[in-house]
Regions:
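Short, basic, low-complexity termini and linkers enriched in Ser/Thr/Gly/Pro
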Residues: 1, 6-17
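Core catalytic alpha/beta fold that binds nucleotide/phospho-ligands
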Residues: 17-142
Length: 142
């Protein structure tokens, strides 16, 4: 196990993770509601995975949930450093839930390739939303 000396103290470093990318985004809930009303299933299938749609549609405040996931996908692309210009599709970034309900993210396709290049081994995701705004933060760790 690696160790490090600080002053006269020897510290053991068990799990050394480095942040390799961060991203944040805010989505306006009314704009997501308008997109769903205007484009319906076409919009939903382009942006969200089937599992994400099942989850959001099972909740009373479904549009807030969709907006939070939209913000998470935007934040993930910022963390990866790709934007949407390098063949990454919206559905390549999927918000899932850990046992106990904590949100996390899985990368697929091109997003997974970029995450691998960064040496990503852990994805920390935080979501929050109100009736008006949804916020997401993504931290990629090696």
């Amino acid at each position: 196990m690696p160790s490090r000396t600080i002053g006269n103290r020897q510290l053991k470093i068990e799990n050394r993770q480095m942040i390799v990318g961060t991203g944040v985004d805010i989505a306006e809930v009314p704009r997501i509601a308008q997109a769903i009303a205007r484009y319906g299933e076409r919009f939903l299938r382009r942006i969200y995975t089937q599992a994400e749609m099942r989850y959001c549609d099972s909740k009373a405040n479904r549009v807030e949930r969709y907006a939070a996931r939209f913000a998470a996908k935007e934040a993930a692309m910022k963390a990866l450093g790709t934007g949407w210009n390098h063949g990454v599709r919206w559905v390549d970034c999927e918000v899932t839930r850990q046992p106990g309900g904590r949100p996390t993210m899985k990368f697929h396709g091109k997003a997974a390739e970029f995450a691998s290049r960064l040496g990503t081994h852990n994805i920390a995701l935080s979501l929050t939303h109100t009736a008006e705004q949804a916020f997401a933060q993504v931290i990629l760790e090696s």
